[in-house]
């Protein structure tokens, strides 16, 4: 135990109070501005302007700090409108610039830790480098052998103060955290991190990166404790638990609460060896070979864990127990199922022959066409029935830019859903995007689609939409090598770095 305390103090000594001065550096907001311009093509322009003055941002920060220390807190109008002005400037726009700058500054300590990993100062383990590339092969390889799955909607913090308190143990700069807390409380448009949306929650488009950073950091905190409890049999010697021991408050909670006389009675549920956990954004799945009783215990453990340790209100209905054999798992834009595939084998014994029926489990990944059409409709590529429409916003672009944008969207979707065994849904998406592209070009040239395609040639669009880049991909070897099997084989492209915008329909 003394060794872990020394490691904890060593990590604390490596923290530096350097973040606060960076808030006043113009290049920080230049980085935030440039990063804001590199957005998804589906997002409309939110007001970034090359003529925006970084000096105005610095003046706003200086004024806010003055108000904070004078305890003379000004109030903004609750109307979330671009007409809201402060000191003669667009408050919403410049507040967005300030928070984007904060996102750049706060990420610096974690980026430095990543560099120390890459430089070999600390050991790099594969479980610290997991990405979306590893999720799809994991599902295909492991899920067919599992029985039950917990479909989890991760709870959100009740208040932003919880996120700031969690961040405090890593960022040892009290001044910058006080300023961050002041911003979060003074801006009404930032007072709520999450906005209700049906049965789940979603982040506002505005300043999504900064709030996602706070949210993901909070999720990482409780996942580190979750991993520690999962590996409790190693008595704190597990490499995957070292990051957990770098914390202060939760270290004390382990010492006072976990290591008690009821230690084994409380944690016996973690003995399950075939337990798999995957998370992406606000959803997670916990799959196991265990019984329904075991999964039910995990469910209520997670609810109590979030409420007692992180003060996050969680309801049992946000965690559903499903049996993989009769349930479709909605995860990462795929509908995944594990179905029994019957197999008849004829056996011959001298004069008698008989049939033996065997059933093997097969993991299927399907592209949900209805939600995808809904996403295309929301992006104005088609109507709610799937009939293609023109994209008037892009009509001012050049012909090559219009074709390139439509083609890039299709290639991204084609790569993302390459793991689906049934490709008919992709063909329908291709039809919608091709005709939407043709109608956009015809609208630009004030012509009909038929006349424009006759003049341009259908082959040009067809060739562009089928053009493939040189991208590494991953397949699983199969025993059969006939053409039908090759056509239906899953192909996992390694250029997927995040879930596609149109696939994120929730």
Swiss-Prot record:
Name of the protein this chain belongs to: Maturase K
A single GO molecular function term of this UniProt record: RNA binding
Underlying gene: matK
Annotated GO CC locations: chloroplast
Localization per record: Plastid, Chloroplast
Keyword terms of this UniProt record: Chloroplast, mRNA processing, Plastid, RNA-binding, tRNA processing
Keyword hit for Cytoplasm: no
Pfam families: Intron_maturas2 (PF01348), MatK_N (PF01824)
Biological-process GO terms, alphabetical: mRNA processing; RNA splicing; tRNA processing
Family indicated by similarity: Belongs to the intron maturase 2 family. MatK subfamily.
Function: Usually encoded in the trnK tRNA gene intron. Probably assists in splicing its own and other chloroplast group II introns.
Domain of life, source organism: Eukaryota
């Amino acid at each position: 135990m003394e060794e872990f305390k020394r490691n904890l103090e060593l990590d604390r000594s490596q923290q530096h109070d350097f973040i606060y001065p960076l808030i006043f550096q113009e290049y920080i907001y230049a980085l935030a501005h440039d990063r804001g311009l590199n957005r998804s093509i589906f997002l409309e322009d939110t007001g970034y302007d090359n003529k925006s003055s970084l000096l105005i941002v610095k003046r706003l920060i200086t004024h806010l700090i003055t108000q904070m220390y004078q305890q003379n807190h000004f109030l903004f109008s609750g109307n979330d409108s671009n007409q809201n002005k402060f000191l003669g400037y667009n408050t919403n726009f410049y507040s967005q610039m300030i928070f984007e700058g904060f996102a750049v500054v706060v990420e610096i300590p974690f980026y430095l830790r990543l560099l120390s990993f890459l430089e070999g100062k600390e050991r790099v383990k594969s479980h610290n480098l997991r990405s979306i590339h590893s999720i799809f092969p994991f599902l295909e390889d492991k899920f067919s052998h599992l029985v039950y799955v917990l479909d989890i909607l991760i709870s959100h913090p009740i208040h932003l103060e919880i996120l700031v308190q969690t961040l405090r143990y890593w960022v040892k700069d009290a001044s910058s955290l006080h300023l961050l807390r002041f911003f979060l409380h003074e801006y009404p448009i930032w007072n709520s991190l999450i906005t209700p949306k049906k049965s789940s929650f979603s982040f506002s488009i505005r300043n999504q990166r900064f709030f996602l950073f706070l949210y993901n950091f909070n999720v990482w905190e409780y996942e580190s404790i979750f991993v520690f409890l999962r590996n409790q049999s190693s008595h704190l010697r597990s490499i995957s638990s070292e990051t957990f021991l770098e914390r202060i408050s939760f270290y004390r909670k382990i010492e006072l609460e976990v290591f008690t006389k009821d230690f084994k009675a409380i944690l016996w549920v973690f003995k399950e060896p075939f337990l798999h956990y995957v998370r992406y954004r606000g959803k997670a799945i916990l799959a196991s070979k265990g019984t329904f009783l075991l999964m039910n215990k995990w469910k209520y453990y997670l609810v109590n864990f979030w409420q007692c340790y992180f003060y996050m209100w969680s309801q049992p209905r946000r965690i559903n127990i499903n049996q993989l054999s009769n349930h479709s798992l909605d995860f990462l834009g795929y509908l995944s199922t594990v179905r029994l595939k019957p197999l008849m084998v004829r056996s011959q014994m001298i004069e008698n022959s008989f049939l033996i029926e065997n059933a093997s489990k097969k993991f299927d990944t399907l592209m949900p066409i209805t939600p995808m059409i809904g996403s295309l409709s929301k992006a104005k590529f088609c109507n709610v029935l799937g009939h293609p429409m023109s994209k008037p916003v892009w009509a001012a672009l050049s012909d090559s830019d219009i074709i390139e944008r439509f083609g890039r969207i299709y290639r991204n979707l084609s790569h993302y859903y390459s793991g689906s065994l049934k490709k008919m849904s992709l063909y329908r998406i291709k039809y919608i995007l091709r005709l939407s592209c043709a109608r956009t070009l015809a609208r630009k040239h004030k012509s009909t689609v038929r006349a424009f395609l006759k003049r341009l040639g259908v082959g040009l669009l067809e060739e562009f939409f089928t053009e493939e880049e040189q991208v590494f991909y991953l397949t699983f070897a199969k025993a059969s090598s006939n053409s039908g099997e090759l056509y239906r084989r899953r192909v996992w492209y390694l250029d997927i770095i995040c879930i596609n915008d149109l696939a994120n329909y929730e």
